[in-house]
């Protein structure tokens, strides 16, 4: 029923609905897991009773194992710092919450083991080291995303879009080749990032520029914050004396930018290109965003890629190497250079490299989360448009793209 409601293909792995957000899932509660949580809550409440009859009631079959794990946790783990609360944090965690976390972890372990046995729907196991899971909040699903966009995302991430390859696999077609180029196998991956006809027609570039515009807004905001003195380019470390409580810090957030009156942002798009000023560097290279200040002798270069998520590490290395010579030339011209190769996946999964950029720009946590959501949606909407136009793809002049035989 949930698959039908969300528009998921029948062959889609249903664990995507119930996995935690850190495992690229929707964090819905499976009834069996919710039932276990309720039993833990009931046992915890009854165990605190002062009535001997209540406390002597028979326990669940799995109670001894859970209680054994709880005792081990309290004896060896409770003093260790396993979260971001800071050393010495004494926030008391209820036993029932710890037991529920055990149940949740057991369920996630089952999902991982199940995914390892899948042939296609297990990419989420590979990208967790370098990608940030999409935060599918109810606010986003209700007010921001359309049902069609959610359906596209879930099926694209689960590799269950009705592309030519899957239609043949499901016995609904005999033609496996791409609608547009007529050469490669028509998978969703090929259509969204690998079709040469779509590349030459500018479809991928327009999606890329949609994401790049959001990043440019983040850079502009960072420059404005530096001008107003909201951020500083000097790092500071706060210390708390033993036996004292930490107080709210008034230290300004760190940013790679300093206040200067001549910060200039140049952006390379499909419709409009730029040239690096010759007094800065004589080069034909054009990073997607070129931010510079002659007064500070500072350059920040940002190169964006919108790849298939599993290709992010490889593409990141390619883009860093691409601007190696330009970085050296700028350094020889006595400029301080920061190069950021950032990635936003074609299915809306952002790479950690983008988070690192936004953090180094000195943006607040609220701003960072907002820009991550916006870049994610921009990439996803761009891919959705490509998907919708897979049989009627048009070039920039409005004419049908000729299928290559």
In which residue ranges do the predicted regions lie?
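Conserved, non-catalytic sequence blocks in retroelement Pol enzymes and Pol-derived host proteins
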Residues: 143-144, 167-171, 201-205, 310-315
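Domain-level recognition of nuclease-like catalytic cores that cleave nucleotide substrates
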Residues: 337-405
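Metal-dependent nuclease catalytic cores in nucleic-acid-processing enzymes
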Residues: 219, 320-335
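Short beta-strand-loop-alpha-helix junction that forms the active-site gateway
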Residues: 286, 298, 303-318, 344-346
């Amino acid at each position: 029923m949930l698959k039908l409601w969300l528009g998921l293909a029948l062959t889609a792995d249903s664990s995507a609905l119930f996995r935690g957000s850190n495992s690229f899932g929707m964090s819905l509660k499976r009834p069996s897991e919710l039932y276990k949580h309720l039993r833990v809550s009931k046992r915890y409440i009854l165990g605190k009773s002062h009535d001997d009859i209540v406390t002597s009631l028979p326990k669940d079959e799995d109670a001894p194992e859970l209680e054994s794990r709880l005792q081990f946790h309290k004896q060896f783990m409770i003093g260790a710092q396993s979260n971001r609360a800071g050393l010495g944090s004494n926030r008391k965690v209820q036993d029932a919450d710890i037991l529920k976390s055990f149940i949740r972890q057991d369920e996630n372990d089952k999902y991982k083991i199940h995914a390892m046995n899948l042939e296609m729907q297990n990419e989420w196991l590979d990208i967790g080291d370098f990608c940030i899971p999409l935060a599918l909040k109810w606010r986003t699903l209700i007010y921001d995303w359309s049902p069609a966009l959610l359906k596209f995302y879930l099926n694209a991430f689960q590799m269950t879009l009705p592309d030519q390859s899957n239609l043949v696999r499901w016995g609904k077609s005999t033609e496996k080749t791409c609608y547009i180029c007529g050469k490669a196998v028509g998978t969703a991956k090929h259509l969204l990032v690998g079709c040469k006809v779509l590349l030459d027609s500018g479809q991928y570039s327009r999606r890329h520029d949609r994401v790049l515009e959001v990043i440019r807004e983040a850079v502009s905001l960072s420059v404005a914050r530096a001008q107003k003195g909201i951020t500083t380019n000097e790092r500071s470390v706060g210390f708390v004396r033993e036996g004292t409580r930490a107080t709210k810090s008034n230290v300004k957030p760190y940013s790679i930018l300093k206040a200067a009156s001549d910060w200039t942002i140049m952006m390379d798009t499909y419709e409009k290109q730029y040239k690096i000023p010759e007094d800065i560097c004589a080069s034909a290279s054009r990073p997607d965003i070129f931010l510079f200040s002659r007064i500070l002798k500072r350059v920040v270069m940002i190169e964006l890629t919108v790849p298939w998520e599993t290709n992010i590490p490889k593409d990141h290395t390619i883009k860093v190497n691409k601007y190696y010579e330009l970085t050296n030339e700028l350094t020889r011209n006595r400029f301080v250079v920061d190069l950021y190769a950032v990635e936003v996946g074609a299915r809306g999964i952002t790479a950690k490299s983008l988070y690192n950029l936004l953090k180094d720009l000195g943006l607040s946590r609220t701003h960072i989360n907002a820009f991550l959501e916006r870049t994610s949606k921009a990439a996803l909407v761009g891919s959705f448009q490509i998907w919708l136009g897979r049989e009627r793809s048009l070039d920039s002049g409005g004419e049908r793209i000729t299928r290559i035989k």
